[in-house]
Amino acid sequence: MHILRFSDLCAQGQARGQRVFIRADLNVPQDDAGRITEDTRIRASVPCIQMALEAGAAVMVTSHLGRPTEGEFKPEDSLAPVAQRLSELLGREVPLVADWVDGVQVQPGQVVLLENCRVNKGEKKNDPELAKKMAQLCDIYVNDAFGTAHRAEGTTYGIAEYAKVACAGPLLAAEIDAIQTALAHPKRPLVAIVAGSKVSTKLTILQSLSKNVDGLVVGGGIANTFMLAAGLPIGKSLAEPDLVNEAKAVIAAMAARGAEVPIPTDVVVAKAFAADAPATVKKASEVAEDDLILDIGPETAAQLAAQLKAAGTIVWNGPVGVFEFDQFAGGTKAIAQAIAESSAFSIAGGGDTLAAIAKYGIEKDVGYISTGGGAFLEVLEGKTLPAIEILQKRAAG
């Protein structure tokens, strides 16, 4: 995949004295008082900003925050808390600029944060007039926001059409490289773990991966539907009986390629979904009518761990059990540890997956941790993301 990279432009001295517009993803969670509760995305944006400053550019950074109404600015929509955190991380003041579409004052060696881009009318619909105005603000447009790459908006797509130069920042470039390594040119065997509560939300991902992967591990409520498809009892567990035929089709598609969807041979059940519910390990064929399946059993976990350790590439999206409750966390912990110990290139994404990675402290053992939720899922579906597509078009001239 050919795209221009901001790091290359900087290395060649092409950013010196230039006005650089960086679209970052600074959409961080806040508490009721507006305080930032988790700043990973802000920290992840720093290398691109530092790169631009060190290259001698005049730097403008923007992002969306929350879901403001276009054309109506409210105090809770402000990037002010982000500007404060960014100032701390960069060790310099980062002024916040409102009403910036018609012009921004910034000198080489300076950085300013442009107020919440989703307040601008036409941002979400990718209005060409807005896009042209934003493109006129800069000499180089840099997209460093993988988390919004699946949306064709003014600051992710439109500006890239009209800017003199459009390129990928280091975070976006790293995401693209990791995805290429894992899905376009994987070292085999390629094993994907797709878990979550519903097949319906991840059916297109399962269908897309079933054409490419050597092993497709399902977990959570998704696994219950696959157990139904295999003729196993699931008691009163969460499942989607109306999607059993789709599950059977995924199993058949894998089998036709000599690959498999491993169905659990044992499970961990409880009579209630609760933090203090007693857990019981049962054979998959012996689940009672009043049982809730809340994790895979130790035998299944050991089989999957062996498969992951022998893999060449691993894609992980979703914990395989209710890992928030320790008695139903064994399966997810075993999978996390197997990924950590495997020599495979691994890529992981999705909020719950990141929480599991943090819980078991394996951040340094995962090849690449994706910052994008919805964008990561769309990549797994085999879709080309609009923000990446426009950078490819611009690179091709």
UniProtKB/Swiss-Prot annotation:
Compartments in which it is found: Cytoplasm
Pathway: Carbohydrate degradation; glycolysis; pyruvate from D-glyceraldehyde 3-phosphate: step 2/5
Catalytic activity reported: (2R)-3-phosphoglycerate + ATP = (2R)-3-phospho-glyceroyl phosphate + ADP
One GO MF term attached to the UniProt entry: phosphoglycerate kinase activity
Main location: cytoplasm
Key word Ribonucleoprotein present: no
Binding site for substrate: 25-27, 41, 64-67, 118, 151
Family, as annotated: Belongs to the phosphoglycerate kinase family.
Cited HAMAP family: Phosphoglyc_kinase
Subunit description: Monomer.
Protein name stated in the entry: Phosphoglycerate kinase
Species lineage: Bacteria, Pseudomonadati, Pseudomonadota, Betaproteobacteria, Burkholderiales
Gene: pgk
